[in-house]
Amino acid sequence: MLEARDISVKYGGTTVLADASLSLLPGKITAIVGANGAGKTTLIKALNGAVPISAGEILLGGKPIDSLTRSQIAREVAVVAQETESRFPVTVREFVLTGRFAYGSSFGWENAGDIDAAERAIADCELVELSGRLMNDLSGGERQRVVLARALASEGHVLLLDEPTANLDLANQTLMFRLVLERCKKQDYAAAIITHDLNLAAEFADEVVMMAKGRIVHSGKPEEILNAANIREIFNVEVLLDRNPSSGKARVTQVY
């Protein structure tokens, strides 16, 4: 479990995140939505201990995150950013194995546990046939699945995903969400995913957090949060909503 209690972040003298509280629970996916500049990425970085907080506290497994080393955090919290750092001239298998470096592994020095974790993650992300391919030769959707597999190989039980589906087509976006959902449900992982796709948030998330101007302004179940009034407030657009006929969940059908 990862919990933020009234946390704030300042850059210089400017507050970019204020009084944010949320809990990431085992087996649950939290979708974080909001316009550009709302503070979503800052929140993810704070939850990972990558940026210092100026107020409040963050607890990882009940322990203050600032009392833990970077290696201790990396063993429990895995981060997937937008498509970055994935064009190295290494194979898919080698790249996924870097997810084990927090345990003291390095290229050529992997133990059986490292290899087993990497192979499970490769299989879970449907990458077995690509495991010998070079990262440089993959499509954007394939590379993002590899980055997710690296995060899963770390076996940290908290996943933080910063717009992992940006620039992907709908099929690959849906696949990414499905893969995260499967890991959360099967192995009791907790996940927070930043996304601009409200329909994916409605379909896959257990909770939706809506942010604006560095604050969490709404949070709750998708059916409670994703309505026309809240979307107008956060994104300054008008939308039409109906129900997905297969799942019965809310979906945006028109933006104007």
What are these regions (language model features)?
Residues 33-35:
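The feature captures the beta-strand-to-loop junction immediately N-terminal to the Walker
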Residues 159-163:
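Catalytic Walker B motif of ABC-type/P-loop ATPase nucleotide-binding domains
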Residues 56-64, 73:
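Conserved ABC transporter NBD signature motif
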Residues 48:
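Helix-to-loop junction immediately C-terminal to a conserved catalytic motif
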Residues 97, 112-130, 155:
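Conserved ABC ATPase "signature" region
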Residues 108, 134-138, 142:
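Conserved ABC ATPase signature
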